[in-house]
């Protein structure tokens, strides 16, 4: 649902899993985990999902943890890769600027500055949840913890339905070591990665890690001078300093930087074949993997190419001080910022009907203090406070060729050329012919019951703009204060009870500014005129036919508003208007856990999650009108979960499971109205399901795992009653193994895996035609085709290591059977009857070389 916000302001348990953990404490050699004689990493697992160190079996909710070694074994470089192996976790990545991250069917990927996330992403406890800045490379990672269910009590804002915490590898002071890695593959894929850990002294350690990767696009560009689509170009670096002046005080300073400059996203129309915009010759077919003829409109954003330019950086300071044997003080201080600009061909055709740009700027500061109590007695607890300050700005710009947009509205992109299929856009010279445009204007007017006179039709046709530009700027400033606490009471050696509470206060300001950038829209004014009563309709139509009407300033002599197409301007063509809101709310949890032995845990937990009130801003309904501010009620969810975690056969067999039920009130969603997407309260919703995983490590040579998740997520009221949540497959499954054997002087290993997900819809309306008819949409959507049926992907790696893994070579393949699938459908063009589809990744393969020292 990429940049759907571009039109959003327009006026026109049986028990199942929490996935067995694969985490471990700091490795004993460079990047290698400690193992026992069976190859089992779980002997040393430590997680901090409950803000204190525990074994995963002790955590009373569904928790998935993966070690850095697991990420390496399965070549997991980003969240989309990770999601395929994690039950109940889904990631749709159109570009690093537009991920949709979902836990148990709940997601949000809106780019509005004022939107609040439902799933929170953390780096070492620092929230990085704004979608435009959340997608980061996973490299030199100690572990990733995925906590499912409402985690507002533990993690605070944004963790309505879960949290993902990336624990980055920290410097070690006991050794100096490093790693270098290189990969190359098809599609001209190259990756370079390195890590260096320096033990400067027994109390000071330094660590630097970085990754750079590049790959050609996966969808061919059919127009000269335009790069193939969906390419990869990412560079990321991290530097960290650890100081331990004593065993009671640890200080970490971490700096992160990432830059992404991929080519444009392949928003491909399946209604219109790609054609040469000059000759009209058909260049390829309608398949999502077929080539695309996309290009930005002339002069848009200073002539920038399609693609993304994104920078993300941050500085984090961590302090852990043992004040006494019972009290430990933790501090997390962080500053983070990101800036993005993405240029998009929204319409998905070879004609520059609509070109879009989204620019996002964000900066945030956060401070958390937490005091933990643990005197080895029956009670453990913590209390804390946090402050969060964020400033965000989203700029959405669009450029229309009004002549081509008119042809689409009139269902005449084929130019009415005799014998030319409706699927083949005509040459630009045909569609820009004033005579044809005049006829199309009369046809559109006729559909409104209005007889457009020939002279007025000719005059308006002559005034249609090839490059009408307008923009929306929405800003949000947030100050939030949190107080929180949690306590666990061990009633007996086998039974413990716990509860937590968090209070949050938000102080928000939302502002909006809309403007037309090069005069009024003639097409927008014409469509607006058709909805007016007489005599105003004819008066406005006649004025729009005056030569040069697009650029004549409004005056007493020419009282024609500055019309936009999607963004009607605020006062004085761009005044910034703001509104304020203050919000308070509580979240809580309560749980019980029974542990008959150290390797078995049964638990039940109830939790309340809360997404803060949203103060949304829509542009005026008419030029120079008042912006439309809407306060959307806080969304709440009540979660009930029971689960079991156990290790059998001397910790060789792990079985985990969870059953859950969620009940939502004031579910926030986006609803399409014409060319407008508005934030609405969809009312009630619910989901229930289960997750289950098994892991078996019979020997040092063989490790197997499998997991399955079922999630039934549905709306329960309003026009969406009965619809599935978007990006919420009912069934997901993954399985894999690692087989290794000593061969000659080294060790050979083979790691195949298969992942499966069932059918998903890409919008909450499930692309149901009855929900997409005028006036809800500008043009009717007659087909339910914006979904992806179930599919499976197979990957494999074959490697050989020498000298205990110091030197390693491997070959790999992803999507081994070249399965065709789509990762998104609909998108911004859907609002104008131009849905687009984005192809998933094809088969890729290559070789990797690694050296450790």
Map each language-model feature to its residues.
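N-terminal Sec signal peptide and the immediately downstream disordered periplasmic leader
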Residues: 1-74, 80-85, 247-248, 315, ...
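Acidic, small-polar-rich N-terminal luminal/periplasmic segments of exported/outer-membrane proteins
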Residues: 38-173, 642
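Outer-membrane beta-barrel translocator/receptor signature
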Residues: 116-118, 130, 139-148, 153-223, ...
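Membrane-embedded beta-barrel scaffold of Gram-negative outer-membrane proteins
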Residues: 318-322, 328-344, 595-619, 631-688, ...
């Amino acid at each position: 649902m990429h940049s759907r916000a571009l039109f959003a302001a327009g006026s026109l348990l049986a028990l199942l899993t929490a996935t067995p953990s694969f985490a471990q404490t700091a490795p004993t050699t460079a990047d290698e985990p400690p193992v026992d004689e069976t190859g089992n990493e779980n002997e040393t697992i430590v997680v901090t999902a409950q803000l204190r160190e525990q074994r995963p079996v002790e955590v009373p909710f569904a928790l998935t943890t993966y070690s850095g070694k697991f990420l390496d074994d399965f070549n997991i470089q980003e969240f989309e890769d990770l999601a395929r192996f994690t039950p109940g976790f889904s990631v749709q990545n159109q570009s690093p600027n537009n991920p949709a991250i979902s836990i148990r069917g709940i997601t949000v990927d809106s780019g509005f500055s004022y939107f609040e996330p439902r799933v929170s992403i953390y780096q070492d406890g620092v929230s990085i949840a704004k979608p435009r800045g959340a997608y980061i490379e996973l490299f030199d990672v100690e572990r990733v913890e995925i906590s499912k269910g409402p985690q507002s009590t533990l993690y605070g804002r944004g963790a309505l339905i879960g949290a993902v915490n990336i624990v980055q590898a920290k410097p070690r002071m006991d050794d100096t070591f490093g790693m270098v890695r290189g990969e190359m593959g098809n599609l001209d894929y190259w990756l370079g990665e390195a890590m260096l850990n320096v033990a400067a002294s027994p109390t000071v350690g330094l660590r630097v890690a970085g990754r750079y990767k590049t790959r050609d696009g996966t969808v061919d560009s059919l127009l000269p001078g335009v790069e193939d689509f969906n390419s990869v170009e990412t560079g990321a670096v991290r530097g960290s300093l650890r100081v331990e002046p004593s065993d009671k005080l640890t200080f970490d300073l971490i700096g992160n930087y990432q830059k992404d400059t991929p080519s444009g996203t392949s928003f491909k129309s399946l209604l219109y074949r790609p054609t040469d915009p000059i000759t009209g010759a058909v260049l390829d077919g309608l398949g999502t993997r077929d080539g695309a003829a996309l290009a930005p409109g002339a002069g848009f954003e200073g002539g920038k190419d399609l693609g993304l330019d994104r920078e993300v950086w941050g500085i984090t300071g961590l302090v852990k001080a043992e004040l006494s044997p019972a009290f430990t003080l933790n501090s997390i201080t962080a500053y983070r910022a990101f800036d993005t600009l993405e240029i998009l061909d929204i319409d998905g055709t070879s004609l520059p009907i609509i070109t879009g740009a989204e620019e996002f700027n964000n900066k945030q500061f956060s401070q958390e203090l937490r005091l933990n109590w643990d005197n080895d007695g029956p009670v453990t607890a913590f209390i804390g406070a946090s402050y969060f300050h964020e400033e965000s700005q989203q700029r959405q710009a669009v450029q229309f060729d009004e002549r081509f947009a008119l042809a689409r509205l009139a269902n005449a992109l084929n130019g009415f050329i005799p014998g030319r299929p409706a699927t083949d856009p005509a040459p630009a010279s045909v569609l820009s012919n004033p005579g044809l445009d005049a006829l199309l204007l009369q046809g559109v007017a006729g559909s409104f019951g209005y007889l457009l006179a020939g002279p007025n039709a000719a005059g308006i046709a002559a005034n249609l703009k090839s490059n009408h530009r307008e923009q929306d700027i929405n800003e949000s400033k947030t100050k939030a204060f949190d107080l929180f606490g949690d306590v666990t009471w061990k009633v007996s050696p086998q039974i413990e009870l716990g509860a937590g509470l968090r209070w949050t206060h938000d102080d928000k300001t939302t502002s909006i500014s809309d403007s037309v950038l090069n005069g009024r829209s003639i097409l927008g004014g014409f469509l607006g005129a058709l909805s007016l009563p007489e005599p105003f309709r004819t008066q406005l139509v006649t004025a729009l036919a005056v030569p040069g009407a697009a650029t004549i300033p409004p005056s007493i002599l020419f009282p024609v508003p500055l019309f936009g197409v999607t963004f009607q301007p605020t006062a004085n063509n761009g005044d910034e208007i703001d509104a304020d809101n203050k919000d308070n709310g509580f979240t809580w949890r309560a749980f019980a856990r029974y542990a008959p032995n150290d390797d078995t845990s049964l638990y039940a937990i109830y939790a309340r999650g809360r997404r803060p009130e949203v103060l949304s801003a829509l542009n005026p309904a008419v030029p120079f009108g008042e912006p439309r501010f809407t306060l959307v009620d806080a969304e709440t969810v009540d979660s009930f979960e029971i689960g079991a975690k156990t290790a059998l056969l001397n910790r060789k067999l792990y079985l985990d499971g969870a059953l859950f039920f969620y009940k939502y009130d004031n579910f926030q969603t986006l609803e399409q109205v014409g060319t407008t997407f508005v934030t609405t309260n969809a009312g009630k919703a619910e989901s229930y399901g289960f997750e289950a995983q098994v892991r078996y490590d019979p020997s040092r040579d063989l490790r197997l795992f499998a997991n399955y998740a079922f999630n039934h997520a549905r709306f329960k009221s309003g026009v969406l009653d009965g619809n599935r949540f978007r990006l919420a497959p009912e069934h997901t499954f993954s399985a894999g193994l690692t087989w290794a054997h000593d061969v000659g002087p080294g060790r050979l290993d083979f790691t195949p895996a298969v992942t499966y997900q069932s059918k998903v819809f890409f919008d909450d309306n499930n692309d149901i035609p009855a929900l997409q008819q005028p006036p809800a949409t500008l043009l009717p959507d007659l087909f339910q085709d914006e979904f992806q049926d179930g599919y499976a992907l197979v990957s494999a790696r074959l490697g050989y290591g020498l000298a205990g893994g110091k030197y390693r070579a491997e070959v790999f393949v992803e999507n081994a059977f070249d399965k065709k699938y789509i990762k998104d459908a609909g998108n911004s063009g859907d609002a104008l009857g131009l849905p687009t589809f984005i192809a998933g990744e094809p088969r890729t393969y290559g070789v990797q070389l690694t050296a450790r020292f």
